[in-house]
Design a protein with these regions (language model features):
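Signal for well-folded cores of large energy- and translation-related assemblies
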Residues: 25, 29, 44, 48, ...
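A structural signal for isolated positions on well-ordered beta-strands in alpha/beta enzyme cores
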Residues: 55, 118, 271-273
Length: 282
């Protein structure tokens, strides 16, 4: 009998959610960048482990739990939708930036949905192991926290244990996704994200995180190479010279970085072409 378990990865920006989901799935499906709230929508990763399908919701930063008119409403809706869908909430903590007060506030808000919460400490490779237990002791009596685990998503420490633990919470059900699916997003979405990630990698201080990349061509050639054309949509004309860079050097670096990432995901030679779209720019 097949089984299913749905989890939502929740945590502060840069706690390591995207790194973890990419590690579990085995492909770079979720954008990784140090720019705040780079996860634009709730991407789903799928891991089939034995007869169990693990469905993982990668959510925007936990800041969107709070009520604020300044936050993007769509991101807030995406976060709460993922929480509603999940069977277990995985609250991920960057153990290097452990903040008791913030954790208590977040858990209190998450407890409103009355679902089991697993506290997952990440980046344990960067601290002394003896520092972990005292932090668990501080939090062990908080309502709805049912378990504690520690990992390093980047160094692949504790990932197998995490997968086994999540699998133990699965229940009998038909699989929601096909055996060969690793995400609810298609190749076009993921390749667009590669380019958006590259833009933020080189220009995170100059360009807004919600910059959009649109696909205009996705075509396999006779030799099985993949030709991709993408349009970078700018809402302000002042971003154009920034992205182009001196003598076009910046956009060249963006293209090369994105092309390399796409090739590593799709395993084909990639011919990537980028253009800047300013028709709706101010």
């Amino acid at each position: 009998m097949n089984k299913v378990i749905k989890i939502a990865l929740i945590g502060k920006t840069n706690s390591g959610k995207s790194t973890l989901i990419n590690n579990i799935v085995g492909e770079k499906i979720s954008i990784i960048n140090k720019k705040i709230n780079t996860t634009q929508e709730s991407l789903i990763g799928i891991k089939n482990y034995k007869n169990i399908q693990i469905i993982i919701y990668d959510t925007p930063g936990i800041n969107f739990l709070k009520v604020s008119k300044t936050f993007n409403k769509n991101l807030k809706v995406n976060l709460w939708s993922s929480i509603d869908e999940a069977d277990i909430l995985i609250y991920m903590i960057d153990i290097i930036r452990f903040n008791y007060k913030n954790i208590i506030q977040d858990i209190k808000k998450l407890s409103e949905v009355n679902k089991p919460i697993l506290l997952l400490f990440n980046k344990i490779d960067l601290i002394d192991k003896n520092e972990i237990l005292p932090k668990i002791d501080l939090l062990k009596d908080i309502k709805n926290i049912t378990s504690f685990l520690s990992i390093s998503a980047k160094k692949n420490i504790g990932i197998k244990k995490f997968i086994k633990f999540i699998s133990s919470k699965s229940y009998n059900s038909k699989w929601i996704y096909q055996n060969n699916e690793i995400s609810n997003k298609d190749d076009i979405y993921i390749t667009n994200e590669c380019t958006r990630n590259a833009i933020l990698k080189f220009l995170h201080k100059e360009i807004p995180y919600n910059i959009k990349v649109k696909n205009t061509l996705f075509k396999y050639l006779k030799n099985n190479d993949l030709k991709i054309k993408q349009s970078i949509e700018l809402d302000n004309k002042r971003y154009k010279p920034i992205i182009l860079g001196k003598n076009g050097n910046t956009i060249k670096r963006i293209r090369e970085c994105s092309q390399k990432d796409i090739k590593s995901i799709i395993n084909n030679n990639i011919h990537l072409y980028l253009q800047l779209d300013t028709k709706n720019a101010k």
